[in-house]
Amino acid sequence: MTPSASPAKAREPLELPWDPERLPPFPAIALKALNLMSGTDSSLIDLCNLIRSDAAFSVAVLRVANSPLVAFSKNVTSVLQASMLLGFQRLRSVVIAFGLKAYVREAFTPLMQSCWRHSVACAILAERAARWSFLDKDFAYTAGIFHDIGKVALATTMPKAYTRVVDRNSELVRESVVQPADLLASERELCGIDHCEAGRLLLAAWDLPPALINVVACHHEQKALASGTSTLISPSCEMSELLGFAAPGAKPLRRYEQILADFPEMARSRFPVDMEELASEIAKEIQAIESA
């Protein structure tokens, strides 16, 4: 009689277990830019000089500066000129978003593209809400960009397993029964770790600030986040899904006005009444960076 398979062997791993050591490093220019932004001596010129040291980032900044999104821009030919036109805040946004795009470039599949667009949309929304609420705009944008970095990590190192995760959750979306916890459970079952924990480990390996790591680890647990800027990421993530920038396997579960209620009062009054107007604004900003 053939012995039955033990529970431990019932599911053979599709690929090697997830290991952050097998991931490529995040672009050094973007990480250095983050350090500049978090330091007391950071300045527009510091950031400009950093960008000029890398050809790819220089081209990205010039393309954004010459895009229709930037008013009065025409024939911007130098990074310094682009920096003065864009300003520190917007320049920082371009560097971080382009850094994430460069990070996933080798595997820029439709899945990765959707994850990237979702992250940028979340970052833009969080930054706006922070600005309107007099909170930390830099932190809000950075947290928005990195909140789903764990998905990128899992999809990069375990593409077959993560495709199964997405397929399973997409089926739940079609049946209109998906919940945020379903994705995390599927990730843990098929990959051995969920994207929140994977993101936490990855950002810790990159030696990023503890406050940022905590947001990435807890962005699906609003109550676990401290007050202030950190609380903007969860509604920004959900809002980006509602506006049409959902990552594969995700679906917005609430209406526009319900999500708005989770933002600070000062931010709620500044968001457009028309959801389509907001979606169009975000799409234009993403397109400007995407084409860089």
Q: Which residue stretches match the model-derived regions?
A:
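Conserved alpha-helical "signature site"
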Residues: 1-170, 177-256
